[in-house]
Amino acid sequence: MTEVQQTEKVTPRLKTKYREEIRGRLQEQFQYGNVMQVPGLVKVVVNMGVGEAAKDSKIIDDAVTDLTAITGQKPMITKARKSIAQFKLREGMPIGTHATLRGDRMWEFLDRLVTLPLPRIRDFRGLSDRQFDGNGNYTFGLSEQTVFHEIDQDKIDRVRGMDITVVTTAKNDDEGRALLKALGFPFKTDQ
């Protein structure tokens, strides 16, 4: 008989911090009667628009490779919904790629994002706190994929930016801002 080795599942560091410290602090701060009212994270969507892929299909493959290395899962390819003659775009052509992260992958990605890539950005003074959508969700853009240490700078063919959306259960922007600040997001202090 062969023995099946049981590997112990490790809870992501940021998730543990949220459960043990942040949730209690937010419950006190906003005077929630129930712990389930405390805002939490739902998902993180990483989107990479690749408009040049309409002309050259190899470009989308490179974008998929980069996003796979960054997020740790294979992204979906976004296709054009309509044909637009001015952009030489036909319906069904690949124009971008996105990955939706949930669960432990989401927590690990956010932990890596806050600790490594954001401080590596040149002239970085913090994230703008004006990019909330009114419902506690936060979207920001990165201008290049090389800030992630998973990307080998010698092997990139072109610089690609990406949008990162953090979806929360917060009811308004103040709750969302408090949650993300507690998770370690570096917001600008003076406007």
UniProtKB/Swiss-Prot annotation:
Keywords, ordered alphabetically: Ribonucleoprotein, Ribosomal protein, RNA-binding, rRNA-binding, tRNA-binding
Keyword Oxidoreductase recorded: no
GO CC terms, sorted: ribonucleoprotein complex; ribosome
Any Gene Ontology biological process: translation
Gene Ontology MF, one: rRNA binding
Function summary: This is one of the proteins that bind and probably mediate the attachment of the 5S RNA into the large ribosomal subunit, where it forms part of the central protuberance. In the 70S ribosome it contacts protein S13 of the 30S subunit (bridge B1b), connecting the 2 subunits; this bridge is implicated in subunit movement. Contacts the P site tRNA; the 5S rRNA and some of its associated proteins might help stabilize positioning of ribosome-bound tRNAs.
Record family assignment: Belongs to the universal ribosomal protein uL5 family.
Name of the protein in question: Large ribosomal subunit protein uL5
